[in-house]
């Protein structure tokens, strides 16, 4: 007897074919992209730094019953326990409460007395590995102190294909190398604090439109399947998979699969992306969890590589689950092999031990669902004990300092005609624009920050946190001006243009604040369904700038935004004497900005994306209307690797501000480029060969009678259990299609536990170890040629030489401090991966014979140093 309805959606989507991308127009009868299957799901083996944690995981999982293993894999249901996602427990073996997973990538969501950190895009603007690590460490400390086991971040999906994508701010940058480095450092910081980090959203999750059927239908779109992101193999490896390889190499404990389909197979049951790319090729040793309600099948997802279902129920609070009881049944009847569930549990516990949860763990001391001190143990159904659910533990420590430092270090000075830094002697200062002031409803007045009222320091969605306070620009500037004996006049109503004109005409300097917001698709703000409708400024921003500029010849524009905005109509106006992009700086917004405005911090930030003249400058538009009848909308990534600055370079289009651009209060010079091959007998590339060991199993399965609900157990309504109502498995499964034959839905090889061949590009966490061998050393001299001490960000780009390759691709960067007149030699190395392309035929990384060059400078378009690279293979 076998399952039917729980897996059919997965297996019809994962048909056998080569992954391809077709044109943009799709009809119901047109051939669509497919995702080739890859089975069986690789079993973890504790490679490298994972060995000890894996050994300990095997020891405890070997003692577990089947139901206990299943309990670790399945959430208990939405709002059933204190965290946004919480697994079942194994109290018999000391796991006395379920593993707690909690948003977000910038702080603890649904909590209090926590910090609100700068967004990922701000971290990218710092180009600083240490600051990325310290932010991760500080966040990890706060999550740990609240009793959270799994931090649901950071994000590298979306990468940033679309500048108007709703959640690009949660990630870092559209450049995979910049994202990969800062992604990895954030993960190291989180996990060094003893909390499991989650690399998300894996993969190709580049827009909000059509990510979920119910959400899209709520907006009036007639679709029956979620969007499919269609990508070719080369683009997948060289662009979107790149930062996830860095995450796996950094030891990330969890990966969250995304809502979208990839080549018409759902992200959480896509055997190509989960089994092959993530587990076999990248050697991922942790566990894959679903995004919330991104789980679409039972057996299909289990065989395709999913390890944890979140939040456990199929739809929020419906009491149904693809796993839980159904996963127990599927093992008992042989549909899912025992080794697959053993591997799920081992992967979860390996991550648990690797970060030290067994030493640091405390119960969650907050409730995601209420700020009341007392409440029901199981909030959704008002059942269980009436107990203390919020202990109001202050976890902020001294993290405001690192938040303020990152805020200043991420403030990009795009333009400066001598207006900055301010001297403090300005007598009359105008502060103009709603974005300077407070949200009249309070900093947390809009649930999940789902509005654009007052200054923008955080965008909207599940990737948010409650502010403990928010220092607005108006407050910080007023404090600064008053302390220097000046006068400050603020108008923070964007409709009060005549009043703004009056203030601007009397001010020696006018600071204008404008913004543009976006977020997750379940919230619609002013017709923006997560994704932005356009790249214009919000809340009458252009009119505010026009008004002030026409009345003040010293206008400084400050932009808080989730990404690029259109500035072409005013950026070169001579009365606009400076432009600042401050991103989403978090709770210390005003303080960090004032540090830069008044010169206490010399700006060193570089824009992590390109500022184009029009939306069309960025290439293909975001898919905002269904294009495949009522089936899955098809988003074809026909641009390949050419996004952001790579696209501008290909088109020979000059942007307003190029990727990597950012001014300082001093100047820097570049000289003395040196390139040296690092020849050694061990530098030859060695494709991985051999095979795995057989799939191990741990403990005994038992019989159905072993997993019946105990007599006298008071079951919680809609709570997801791993237990059975009956020894009749069909009755326990409640599956109307129970009885299908294996041949109808089980992919070939999916249950094969015999030794499997290793992939050439695999062999260790992050991929083939020889990919990371250094082949070339590059050095350059950086000189502070000005009169102010400051940081510079040297950037190294490589021309890979092929006729269809980008002009340059970023490969290395740093942030170095230089006193006036000081010189430093910056030295870095290029490894094999930095110089290679993905060969779709060989299914491996290859350094082509095309001549290659190295370029060093201060941005993607300011590269004064260049030299040929020695031929290395």
Swiss-Prot record:
Q: Does the keyword Glycoprotein apply?
A: yes
Q: Which GO terms describe its cellular component?
A: extracellular region
Where is this protein primarily located? secreted
Keywords assigned by UniProt? Carbohydrate metabolism, Cellulose degradation, Glycoprotein, Glycosidase, Hydrolase, Polysaccharide degradation, Secreted, Signal
Residue ranges that the Swiss-Prot or TrEMBL entry lists as coiled coil:
none
- Active site as annotated: 291
Which Gene Ontology terms cover its molecular function? Answer: beta-glucosidase activity
- Map out region (Disordered) in residue numbers: 730-765
Give the superkingdom in one word.
Eukaryota
Catalytic activity reads: Hydrolysis of terminal, non-reducing beta-D-glucosyl residues with release of beta-D-glucose
Q: In which pathway does it act?
A: Glycan metabolism; cellulose degradation
What's its job? Beta-glucosidases are one of a number of cellulolytic enzymes involved in the degradation of cellulosic biomass. Catalyzes the last step releasing glucose from the inhibitory cellobiose.
The family annotation for this protein states: Belongs to the glycosyl hydrolase 3 family.
Q: What is this protein called?
A: Probable beta-glucosidase A
* Protein source organism: Neosartorya fischeri (strain ATCC 1020 / DSM 3700 / CBS 544.65 / FGSC A1164 / JCM 1740 / NRRL 181 / WB 181) (Aspergillus fischerianus)
